[in-house]
From Swiss-Prot:
Gene from which the chain derives: flaH
Function: Component of the archaellum.
Name of this protein: Archaeal flagellar ATP-binding protein FlaH
UniProt keyword annotation of Magnesium present: yes
Family under the similarity heading: Belongs to the FlaH family.
Binding site for Mg(2+): S38
Major site of localization recorded for this protein: other
Keywords assigned by UniProt, alphabetized: Archaeal flagellum, ATP-binding, Magnesium, Metal-binding, Nucleotide-binding
Subcellular location: Archaeal flagellum
MF term (GO), any: ATP binding
Source organism: Methanococcus voltae
Binding site for ATP: S35, K37, S38, I39, Q61, K193
Amino acid sequence: MKYAKIELERDDVHKRFGGGIPLCSIIHIEGEESSGKSILSQRLSYCFLQNSYSLSYISTQSTTTEFVKQMTSLKYMINKKLLNGNLLYIPVYPLISDNTQKDDFIKKSMTTRAFYEKDIIIFDCLSTLISNDASEVQVGDLMSFLKRIASMNKIIVYTINPKELSDQVVTMLRTAATMVIKTETFSFGGNLKNSAKIVKYNMAAGPFQKVMVFRVDPGLGIAVEISSVA
């Protein structure tokens, strides 16, 4: 089994995730709004790029300019990766208010070859994109397709807000994934913290921490709390 490196010198995220991410993985990151899904996706995308993997990032959250500014604020510098083509950023931000265009996103996502030419493919936020046509049959087709893509030594990452999908569809997405992470926020000592709980991790490279408590610091990105509270 081969593993993609996710190590950055300034944080310990890679240690919490077992030292690396197995190739052929499908990573499901689930949580409500502002629970930390996107920052985890951004942290993973940056470390993949820093370790010489190419990456497609399909986003409902930000325009290209907004994404670059957000990453820069966290010192996740991606400008050169965009310019040299290692990072393909695809903003679908305008589509989230256009239901007509959203209706066939599942079909479009399986026929847009450019998405899958990179080593890593990230959808943030997948539930927003498929909420209008997320029947069990269509989602089953999508996950079968993503499994075929991942089997070619690629890694698929997607985030979802479970409130945007039916319970049956959320269960299908969790079941199809090789790694499931649930994010949430909580108050501790008067401060708001984020947590990422690994509830499923197939083919882990090594021991991993089931609950990672972290905060987001400007100029640093994710800062793992040493004294984690589960």
